[in-house]
UniProtKB/Swiss-Prot annotation:
Main subcellular localisation: cytoplasm
Top-level taxonomic group: Bacteria
Subunit: Homodimerization via its hinge domain. Binds to DNA via its C-terminal region. Interacts, and probably forms a ternary complex, with MukE and MukF via its C-terminal region. The complex formation is stimulated by calcium or magnesium. Interacts with tubulin-related protein FtsZ.
Span list, region Flexible hinge: 666-783
Free-text comment on this protein's domains from its UniProt entry: The hinge domain, which separates the large intramolecular coiled coil regions, allows the homodimerization, forming a V-shaped homodimer.
Protein name, per record: Chromosome partition protein MukB
Amino acid sequence: MIERGKFRSLTLINWNGFFARTFDLDELVTTLSGGNGAGKSTTMAAFVTALIPDLTLLHFRNTTEAGATSGSRDKGLHGKLKAGVCYSMLDTINSRHQRVVVGVRLQQVAGRDRKVDIKPFAIQGLPMSVQPTQLVTETLNERQARVLSLAELKDKLDEMEGVQFKQFNSITDYHSLMFDLGIIARRLRSASDRSKFYRLIEASLYGGISSAITRSLRDYLLPENSGVRKAFQDMEAALRENRLTLEAIRVTQSDRDLFKHLISEATDYVAADYMRHANERRVHLDQALAFRRELYTSRKQLAAEQYKHVDMARELGEHNGAEGSLEADYQAASDHLNLVQTALRQQEKIERYEADLEELQIRLEEQNEVVAEAAEMQDENEARAEAAELEVDELKSQLADDQQALDVQQTRAIQYNQAISALARAKELCHLPDLTPESAAEWLDTFQAKEQEATEKLLSLEQKMSVAQTAHSQFEQAYQLVAAINGPLARSEAWDVARELLRDGVNQRHLAEQVQPLRMRLSELEQRLREQQEAERLLAEFCKRQGKNFDIDELEALHQELEARIASLSESVSSASEQRMALRQEQEQLQSRIQHLMRRAPVWLAAQNSLNQLSEQCGEEFTSSQEVTEYLQQLLEREREAIVERDEVGARKNAVDEEIERLSQPGGAEDQRLNALAERFGGVLLSEIYDDVSLEDAPYFSALYGPSRHAIVVPDLSQIAEQLEGLTDCPEDLYLIEGDPQSFDDSVFSVDELEKAVVVKIADRQWRYSRFPSLPIFGRAARENRIESLHAEREVLSERFATLSFDVQKTQRLHQAFSRFIGSHLSVAFEDDPEAEIRRLNGRRVELERALATHENDNQQQRLQFEQAKEGVSALNRLLPRLNLLADETLADRVDEIQERLDEAQEAARFVQQYGNQLAKLEPVVSVLQSDPEQFEQLKEDYAWSQQMQRDARQQAFALAEVVERRAHFSYSDSAEMLSGNSDLNEKLRQRLEQAEAERTRAREALRSHAAQLSQYSQVLASLKSSYDTKKELLNDLQRELQDIGVRADSGAEERARQRRDELHAQLSNNRSRRNQLEKALTFCEAEMENLTRKLRKLERDYHEMREQVVTAKAGWCAVMRMVKDNGVERRLHRRELAYLSADELRSMSDKALGALRLAIADNEHLRDVLRLSEDPKRPERKIQFFVAVYQHLRERIRQDIIRTDDPVEAIEQMEIELSRLTEELTSREQKLAISSRSVANIIRKTIQREQNRIRMLNQGLQSVSFGQVNSVRLNVNVRETHATLLDVLSEQQEQHQDLFNSNRLTFSEALAKLYQRLNPQIDMGQRTPQTIGEELLDYRNYLEMEVEVNRGSDGWLRAESGALSTGEAIGTGMSILVMVVQSWEDEARRLRGKDISPCRLLFLDEAARLDARSIATLFELCERLQMQLIIAAPENISPEKGTTYKLVRKVFQNTEHVHVVGLRGFAPQLPETLPGTQTEDTPSEAS
C-alpha cells in the first residue's frame, strides 16, 4: 500500500508576531486556537503563500471584510510581514519518503504601493535532523539571531553534501516540481489552474459552499479527456498546420512573387538604366570622337572652300569685266543686224516698187492707147447720135401734120416707101444710079470689101501712127532715162551720154557680179578671224587654267601627254571604282554579318546565362552539348534514386502516421469497430479499463492478456449470445470477457510470472506463454510513450522526407532547367562568342572605313586630276584644229583687203541695183537718141483721111445693107399706089421716123456705153498715173533711206550679221551663264563657308560639351562601377543582351518597371523613399543604391529556417522547391484529416458515460457524510438538452449538414459551432467566434450540467444553496465537495506521474467554531477515512482530544510584539507528547 505524502511542518520567519516559528502539522487535523488577533489567520496566510506564491491571487481578508474589494491595498500580505527578509517554508515528506522543503522568501518593497517581493525555492535531500529554522537563521548570541538572505541560504546549502537548492523564476516551474514530488494534487500549468487551486483553498479556508466552486464544478471535478482532447487537438493541430501550411504556401508564394516581382522589376529598372548609361557612355565617347573627326574634317573643308572662294571670286571678276565688252559688242551686232534687216526690207521694197513701176508703166501705156481708141469711138458715136437726132427731129416735124392713124396698107406703103428711100439713099451714097434691090446684095459685098479694105488701111495707118507716136515716145523715154541716170542734159547730148552710161553700166555690172563671191570670201575670212580670236581666247584660258603659258608648238606634245595621263588616270579611276566597290561590298558584308551577329547575340547571351545558371546549380562546367546531354542522363538516374529513397521514407512515414493514428484512438482501441461493438454489447474495452496502467506495468499486462488485450468486458455473456449470431462487421478474432467494468481485476487468469514473461493457464490443458513486449502499447502511458517515440521517429522521417523531397524537387527543377536549356538554347549555347566576332568585325569595319576614307581622298584627287586632264584635252581638242589659224598672221590684212573690194563691188551693185533697169531700158532704145522723129504730123493727116474714107465706106455698106434688108418691102408697091399722095408721104415719113428713132436709140445707147467705157478707161488711166507717181515718189524715198542707212543689203549680209550676233550672244550667254554659275557657286560657297563656320562653332561647342559630359559621366560612372563592384551586383545589372536595345526601348523598359515598383513597394516606406531618390536622372548611383536596398530588403525577408541561402535569386528557386514540398505536405495531411461527425458524437457520448460512472463512484463516498440536518450529499450530472440534440444530429442526421463539414472554408470546430447555431437559433452566442464556440463544443464537460444536492431532513433531496442550509451545514457540505474535488484531481493526475506517489491532501477551515460537535466529528472521520490533513482555526479548543492543537496568544513585551504558542497533541488514546519546538502548557515557550 502506497503511503500518502504528508505536510510535516510550517515555518514562519520574521512574520508579524513570529520571528522563527515552526508548526508541526498533525497527520489528520491541526487546530489553531486563540483569540482575536492571536495570529491564526497569519499562520494560515503563511501556509497559503508558500503553497501558491502568486501575488495576483493572494488576498487575505478578515471575515468582516467579506465581499469588500478595496479594504486593503496590499491584500493583507504586506501588513503580516516584518521589515527585512521573511520566509514561509513547508516541510513535506512524499510517498517515496523523500523530504522536500518548499517555501518562499518574502520581502517588503519600499514605497507607497506596499508591494511584496516573493521568490519561491525548494530544498531536496535535507537530513531529517536539520530543522527549517536552522537553515534560514544564524544565531548571534543567546538571545539574538539573524535571518539569512536567499543568496546566503544558497551558499549555506551548497556546503551541505547531498542537499539540492533550487530557486525558481516562474511559479509554473515551482508548482511543476511540487506536483512531480507529490506535494500538490494537480499540475498547475497556467494561471487559470493556479486560480482554481487558490479558489479551492480559499473556499475551504472561509467555509461554506463557494459560488466560484459551485459554478465551475465541471472544471474542478470533470477531468479533461486527454484522449479526446488530444485527438481533437491533433486534428485541430493538423488543421492549424494545414492553415499554417496554407499560410506558408501563401507567404512563400507571396515571398516568391514578391521576390520575383521585386527582383525582376528592380533588375529591369536598374539594369535598363545601367545598360542605358553604359550604352550612352559608349555612344557619347563615339560621338565625342565623331565630333572631333568631323571638326577636323570641317576645318579642312572650310580651308578648301576658302581657297575655292578666292579662285571663283577672281574668275567672277574677270567674267564681270568681260561681260561689259561682250554686251557692247552684242548690242552693236544686234544693231547691225537690225540695220541689215532694215536695209534688206528697204531693198525688198525698192525692188518690189520698181517691179510695180515697170508693170504700171506698161499698163499706163496700154491704157493710153485704150483711152485714145475709146475717145475716137466716142467722137464717132457722138457724130452718129447727132445725125440720128437731127433726122428724127426732121421727120417728126414733117409728120407733125400727118394722120396719126394708118392701116396696114398704109404701113406697107410706108415700108415700101422706106425701102425706096433706102434704095435712093444707097444709090446716092454709093454713087450707083443703077442700083436695084436685086443687085444690092452684090454691091453690098463689094462695098463691104471696100469697107474692109478701108478698115485695114485705117488700121495700117493707125499702126504707123502708133509707131511714129512710139518712136516719138521712145526718144522721149530714152531721153528721160538718160536724164534720170545722168541728170539734166541737152537733147543733143543725150546720145553721147547714153553710150557712156551704157559702157559704165557694163563695168558696174561686172563688179556687181563679184559681190557674192567677195562676200562669201569675206565671210569665210571673217569666220576664220573669229575662230582665230576664239582660239586665242581658248589658248589664254587654257594657259590660265594650266597655270602656265604654252607656245603653239608645245600644244601637240602637251595633248599627247594629257591623253596618256587620262588613260592612266582612267585606269586608276576604273580600278579605284572596282576597289571601292570591293571595299564597299566587303563593308556591306561585314555590316550584314554584324547585324546578323547582333540579332544572334541576345539569343547567345541568354543561352550563356542559362548555361551559367546550370553550371552554378550543378557545379559542373560544360564545354559541349554532349556533356549537357550526358549530365542530363546522370540527373535522371540521380532523380530516380532519390525518388525511390523518398518513396521508401514516405512509406515508412505513412506507416508511422498510421500507427500513431491507431494508437491515438480513445480507449486504446486499434480497431474502430471494437468501439461500436462495445457500445452495442453495453460493455467496455479491456484496454479502456487498463487505460491508466503505468508504463512499468504495461509489459506485464500486455503479456498477461496477450491476444485478448483488445477484448470487450461485458457484464453478462449470456445476454449477448444472441447478438453474436450473424455478426460480420467485426475483427477476425473477437474476445469477450465477463466481468464488472467498474471493479474488474486480473483474477480471471491463473498466471505464473517468469523473467520478462508470463505463463497463463487458460485451462487445464492449455497454457499460453507470452514474453513481455519490448514496445508495449497496453495502457495510455505505454501508448503515449510509444506515440512519443513514433513522433520522434516521424520527425526524423519527416525531416529526411523533406530533405529528400527538397533534393528531388531540386533535381527535378534542375532536370526541367536542363530540358528547357536543351530545347531552347542547346543549338546556340556552344557556338562561338558573337560579341567577340562582332568586336573583330567592328575592328575590320573601322579599318575598312579608314581605307575607304583614304581611298575616297585618293580617288577624289585622281578624279580631280582626271577632270583637269579631260578639260585640258577638251580645250586642246578645240585648239589643235585651229593651230594654223593661230599661226596665220596675215588673216586680218586679207580681211581688210577683201572688205575694200567688197565695198567697191557693193557700190557697183548698188549702182546696178539703182540704175540697172534704166540702163536695161535705155540699151534697146539708145539708138533712137541719134535723131528726133519729123513726119509725125503727116501721118496724123493721112490717118484722119483714111479714117474718113473708112467711115464713108461703112455708111455705104450700111445703106446697102438696109436696102438688102428691105428687099421684101419693094413688093408693097400696090399698097403705095392705093394711098393718096398724102398717105404715101405720111407713110414714108413715119417709116423714116421709125428708122431715125431706132437709129437715134442705137446711137444714144452706143454713145452712153462708149461714154461710160471712156470714163472708166479715163479713171483707170488716172488711177494708174496716180499710182505710178506715188510709187515713183516712194521709190525715190526708199532709195534715199537706203542710202541714209549706209549698210550693204546683199543676200548674205543678214546671215553674217545674225551669225555674228548669235556668236556674240552665245559668248555673252556663256559668259553670263558662267558668271551666274560662279555667282551661285560663290553664294553657295559663301553659304557653305558660313554653314561650315557655324558648324565648326557648333561642333567645337558640342565637342567641348560632349567631352565635359564624357569626363563628368566618367566620374559618375566610376562611382557607379565602384558601388556595383563593392556590392557584388555587377553580374545582375550588366545584362549584355540589353546592350542591343535602343535608349528609348531601355527607357521605356525602365519606366514600366518604375511604375510596377511604385505599386509593389507602396507599403514599404524605406524602399519607397530610396526609389523616390533613385528617380533623379542625374544621380545614377542612387538607382544602384535602390537595387542594393531591394536586395538587402529581400535578404532580410528570406526565411533562414527553410531557405539556406542569402541570395534572393537563389532563394526564389528554393521557394519554388519549398512550395512544391508544402503542397505535397498539405495534400498528404488533408488525406489524413478525415474525421466523421458520428465519430465525434460517439467519442463525446462515451466520455460522458464514463465520467457519469466516475461521478457516481464519487457519490458513493459521500453517502455517509452528514452535517446537522444534512443526511447525505451527492453530485447530480445531466446532459444538457441542446447538447444532447447536437449529439443526436451528429450521430444520426449528419448527412443533412454535410454542407458545413465538407466546406473547405470551415474548420471542424467552426462547422460544429455553425451546426449548434443552426439547431439552437434562440441561443445568443454573444461576441464569441465560431472557432471558440466549436472548441467549447468539442469539450465533453460543456455537455454536462452539475449541481450539488443534499438530503436534508424531511425536505428530501434539494439543491445545496447557502440560503437553504445553516452555516455549519453549508461548511460541512462545502468541505465534502472540496474533498471530492481533491480526490478527482488525484485520479486525473495519476496518469501524469508515477503510481508510487500519492499526493498530499490538506485543506483549511477558518472559524471552525461555527460547526457543532457532530459536524466536527464528521470532519475528523472524513479526514481519517480519506487520509486528509486539515488545519482548523477556532477561538477555543473545539476537539483537543484529537489531532494536534496549538494555543496562540499575542503578547507585547518591551515594545516588542510576539505570539506565544503552546502545542498539545490529542490525548484521547494516549498521553500527549511534547512536540518539537514547543513546551507543555505548564511551561510555555516564548519566542522573540
